[in-house]
Amino acid sequence: MMPFYRSVSTRTRSVPLIAAVCFFASAAPCVAAVDDSGKYLFICTGDQARKSPDFLAVVNFDERSSQYGRVIGKADVQGASATGNEFHHIGMSADGTTVVCGGLLSVLKSQDQIFFFDVSNPRAPKFHSSANPPLSAITDDFQSLPQGGFLVTMMGGAQGHSPGRVAEFNGQLELVKEYPETPPAEGFNPHGISLRPEVNLMVTSDFICPSTTLDAVAGGLDFRGSVRVWNLRDRTILRTIEIPGAGGTIDVKLIPGDPSERGYTAGMLDEHLYLLDTRRGTAKAVFDFATISKGGWPQLLRLTRDGRRLFISMNQAGKVAMLDISRPDEPRLLKILELGANSGPHYIALTRDEKRLIISDYFLNQDGFGKVHAEGDHKIHVAVVTSNDLRLDQRFQLDFNTAFAQGAARPHGVAVLERTYAHD
């Protein structure tokens, strides 16, 4: 990506050893490893008034720091596409030097909709460039690629209708192509994405026809209920898992290491967790979120690397649920984290050590031009994670209504820097 620092594979516990070697080495200059892992939190943020530029915020995420939980940096989008993008999901490059934010509603102003930031110096990020795939719009989720670059779900076509696409960017942040070559004619509005490169597998989940969320389009919201199973290497769709009545399969995650190549999605309106059989193309309801809170809108999923724990945000319920999925067809509720009425949790992210879960309280408010009004309270929460519990870290207090001089801001995608790099 943008090689300000050279990436190395040294683990955190090796840093003191390297420092010692440098100290005792002879006159030759020595390169030490510096570990930024878990010290910086990036947040894709929109101006609530839609007048000031959208921006990437940097928060001190070092638990040992006196500035823990404070905004310490900010980079505005530059140029003609700076405002009104509705910053949405976030991605971070495999080498930790680039952050990308998606403009969910950029298409409404006919402007660029994917925004790259150089975070080589995490305390002072810089806007790098923007892009506008010609065949698609409504930028949603990002999946970094090990060789550099990203896969990006684009929920709509160029005018925000169906079909959408999956766009690919290479390590130089250049658009490679939009997939598939010939997309499904009906219901292809990809939002969630998950990969297992070791078994050549990708899945995407269809959520909603974006144009139906606008006041200018008559009628109600046209939710989707389907998951696409892809050949990752060829970027082609192998089969579709239909889930009639799901009411919006907003996210999808493959179970890490699962020999049967299964995964999960959730129906936002029917409130069920579905176990997906990607080989047979079937889905089975295995948990009912209405038992936690009816009408709670289960949304984004995160799984631990061992495939034994699942976290899900419940936007309208003001909760985050933690499930034991060690038996994938029989999930068991472990903990409900209560964030309060009108909190509106949506985006969630686990740290690499899986000891902290970050939660942002904002989904989408289309203000005076659309049908979706899920504002939330604009707070960022951190929960301490153990094998069977979630509890709020009371030291971390961050409210985007008051954090910036320009006024209230809407925080959405969050990502923690996990990087060790060489330093002279």
List PLM regions with ranges:
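Beta-propeller blade signature
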Residues: A57-F61, D112-S120, P163-L173, G219-D234, ...
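Asp-box/WD-like beta-propeller blade repeats and closely related beta-sheet repeat scaffolds
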Residues: D112-Q113, V119-P197, I208, T212
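Blade-loop segments of beta-propeller domains
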Residues: Y68-Q143
